[in-house]
Amino acid sequence: MSGASSGTAIGAHLFGVSPEYRVLIGDGGAGPSKSLSEVSFSVWYRSRAARLVILCLVASFLVPCLTFLIAEAVMGQTVTTPLSLTLDHWSEVRARAHNQGVEVRKKKWITLCEAEWVMMNVGWPREGTFSLDNISQVEKKIFAPGPHGHPDQVPYITTWRSLATDPPSWVRPFLPPPKPPTPLPQPLSPQPSAPLTSSLYPVVPKPDPPKPPVLPPDPSSPLIDLLTEEPPPYPGGHGPPPSGPRTPAASPIASRLRERRENPAEESQALPLREGPNNRPQYWPFSASDLYNWKSHNPPFSQDPVALTNLIESILVTHQPTWDDCQQLLQALLTGEERQRVLLEARKQVPGEDGRPTQLPNVIDETFPLTRPNWDFATPAGREHLRLYRQLLLAGLRGAARRPTNLAQVKQVVQGKEETPAAFLERLKEAYRMYTPYDPEDPGQAASVILSFIYQSSPDIRNKLQRLEGLQGFTLSDLLKEAEKIYNKRETPEEREERLWQRQEERDKKRHKEMTKVLATVVAQNRDKDREENKLGDQRKIPLGKDQCAYCKEKGHWVRDCPKRPRKKPANSTLLNLED
């Protein structure tokens, strides 16, 4: 028994447990009985493996719990902003910018949104925004002419505007709500209601009776003075209308067309708004044929906005249309989306009291209204309103003609082989107007236009322009003069052909001279070779005849009998006598 107890004690000591644990494993010997808690504490205290196992169990339980709690806390505190939204979808933002021909970088994107645009003091928040008003304010700072502009930020603000105007699905929930339309001010006095047969065009005042001419008119002459003669009045009924069933009133355009067909002799040709007798303006609306010709003989606004803008500018200057005519002109020549862009850009240019563009809605609605105003072109105030309206409309057309910045399209404009420098410069400026928001006539953009003009010219002009001394001090007109000089000094096709022929002739002469030298060398070598062979041939033996001497070359004897051949003297032989 004592041996078993000692063995158990030794085993307990080896496994790091208390000797009292022998009671739990069935030691029948006498000894103190310990409780389970005391035994567990003893195992925890003495066994390192037990402590390690318990710590691992506790850690495996606490780590997931803490991770879950931290994740819940972080997710509960994260706020999605326009800036973070664009960073989460950065690949789509870069693709959108690439489609517009520009490149953006994430680091600069963050810097501009959080710092530089905020410091412009135009209301841009640090977290970014998709509000078109804030984007427009930042654009004004970026597109400012001269040294106050920021051309390097153009790709980033254009990409912001693209995300706001053509938002993808992940941007739409963060767009600001549209502003409610501004209510029109109520007139102080009630306006008289228009009759059912009234037209949208202003009422033509009744002209005064014409003064009798000094000279009697020639009835046989078909000519009239369009600048001084009052046009014939519109036909009207003379006397009370006939009694009978009343027909519905026709539209003004249909009435004018019907009257023109019925009474062609009494109808005058439609002319622009101009002053008639007694300085009273006369008014004729646009004809359908004019609108059709303008639309069919000019490219669409989306294809060539500059050409259509120039056309509308000439129409506004020569015809001096009213507000209704301007709407009719825009509706005939532009699409719905293009009209909205033009009107939006025009309302941005409404001047305030200080002459700068204003943001006051009442001033904008009063100066450039979207609904038909009560402007009478017969009064100076009405004509002044129409003049300012037409100027703003032209500004809106030029603003809407600016496409997203695409410098790649500008770089593709290169000078043709036979194109003059002046024509190339005009095409280059047109590309700047069409594909960038910059004005090539602005002195602040002269450096970029000069670089494009130099590096995109034809190779011969480019090489000579780059070698000019003091190139930094040249203006665009100076470079154009130098390019014209280089272009005019170009050789004609006949001169080029003659130069090539002379060069080919010189090349042939040089080749002939080289071939002559080679042939002379070969002939000299052959001559030396023949000379050596002849020399060796002289030294060879000539065959002898049958009766010819090999020594003296004479015939009649052989060499052994030749008398000219020296003969050897015979040696004196001494005979020995054997007897001696």
Swiss-Prot record:
Residue numbers spanned by region Disordered: 171-282, 491-514, 560-580
Biased composition (Basic and acidic residues): 491-508
PTM: Glycosylated by host.
GO cellular component: host cell plasma membrane; membrane
Positions on the Extracellular side per record topology: 73-580
Gene3D superfamilies in alphabetical order: Gamma-retroviral matrix domain, Human Immunodeficiency Virus Type 1 Capsid Protein, Zinc finger, CCHC-type
Ranges that cross the membrane: 52-72
Cytoplasmic face residues: 1-51
Positions annotated with a glycan in the UniProt record: N134, N572
Composition bias, Pro residues: 174-193, 204-220, 230-245
Stored Pfam families: Gag_MA (PF01140), Gag_p30 (PF02093), zf-CCHC (PF00098)
Location(s) in or outside the cell: Host cell membrane
Single GO term (MF): zinc ion binding
Segments of skewed composition (Polar residues): 571-580
Compositional bias ranges of the Low complexity kind: 194-203
UniProt keywords, alphabetically: Glycoprotein, Host cell membrane, Host membrane, Membrane, Transmembrane, Transmembrane helix
PANTHER family, alphabetized: GAG_P30 DOMAIN-CONTAINING PROTEIN
Protein name, per record: Glyco-Gag protein
Organism, as annotated: Feline leukemia virus
